Amino acid sequence: YIKALAAKYDTAGTTRTFHTTSGKEVALTGPYGWKIDQTAETDNLVLMAQTGINQEREVQFSQQAASHSGADWGNTYAEVDFGAQHVYMYENGALTWDAPCVTGNVSKNYTTPEGIYSLTYKQADRVLRGAKRADGTYEYESHVDYWMPFNGGIGFHDASWRSKFGGTIYQYSGSHGCINLPVDKAKLLYEKVYKGMPVLCHN
């Protein structure tokens, strides 16, 4: 019964259709979405069986999304279009911010993954480091003013070392997977985003 409930309500990890800013429809999956708390629901079911009390209540979720009706990411989210090398921010259905970007370097297999994610947190004044080498140094160390991760070590940040964004830069001189942004644009995005906000990445 609980597994049937999960199959009905869970959206995390499922494939969903996203209508992009450019007008395409793309199929995306990812960790963002609703997820029933199967342990809690099982415990509640056992309790109801033991007490004989049948009660109507809300289903308990271990992970929540923005909306139960329509697209579960709702109408406030960030969209990263790899093909256009552009980021869009929607708030309550209105486009309120956008910027050119540089994503993961395709030629070095640092391609940024597609998917539906949520912003983990945001932090100002951060040093981003690559993998640690045997001698104790790091593959790279980059100071950023605005750090907004959403997929492990992948996130939005300013890239003051770049003078150009957009175009085909990502194919030969892209990032290690992050979404590089102009400093002034990153500052404005930083002011808008919040923990748990949906982030949709697509080709």
Regions found by a protein language model. Name each.
Residues 85-87, 95-96, 104-108, 123-127, ...:
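Solvent-exposed loop/turn segments at secondary-structure junctions
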